[in-house]
């Protein structure tokens, strides 16, 4: 019998949640996802030094203003890392918009267009890029605009059913509902461990997946943020799963049958009317975990973006 990673690939598109080229070469995922924390981590790897130097050189040619140079270097570094990753995968790279723009629709759209132009100027076409945005109301509206321009989006930091519904109604290409971070919250609150089959994060993604398929939404569901392979295996059959290298290694080393847990019902039920802004805020606010985790996720990505900027500024 093949290992669990090989079996999982037959049921689900496997994506690597990393900016590290060596890990991507080793596990040969279809796609890869990055975020500000992963870019910061990758920027500290020696083999990426030339990419940082090239990004600084680009930024200095764009502007004499140091603050602008820092911004441009960070953007170009994310794109340069994305370009390197694209050499080793057949699919798409997800590159994230600055988390500090999470409540700024116009700013998010402008930054997304800028990142896509950087990729396009390097010969990378839109069908190989996903722009990551936080699943705030403003982020979802930004994605709605971008999708109409042919820029596909990956809506991340998704914790509530309201966020998932709003994303589908906006016609976004893909969502990344988080699993492990939801489980973390309930584990801390209830002071207990969860079996994978009753893991609150697993149940959340399962509910979202089944809802999308029941109403025939085309938005891709890509489970993210895993704490163990049990969570991953409970979501076998999900459209895509983005998995960190350590858990890909565990799956590769594990033997035993992988059972399909999520099955596309191929439904075509009449869809409810799209949520209003007020309805979205009300429904999202009914979920204390989601409110807390969305805010925390944005703050943490912003902190890592700040660390990356400080590192770049020291090199300018």
UniProtKB/Swiss-Prot annotation:
Active site: 132 (schiff-base intermediate with substrate)
Entry-linked PROSITE patterns: TRANSALDOLASE_1 (PS01054), TRANSALDOLASE_2 (PS00958)
A biological process term (GO) from this entry: pentose-phosphate shunt
Subcellular location: Cytoplasm
Primary site of residence: cytoplasm
Pathway: Carbohydrate degradation; pentose phosphate pathway; D-glyceraldehyde 3-phosphate and beta-D-fructose 6-phosphate from D-ribose 5-phosphate and D-xylulose 5-phosphate (non-oxidative stage): step 2/3
The protein's assembly and partners: Homodimer.
Protein name according to UniProt: Transaldolase
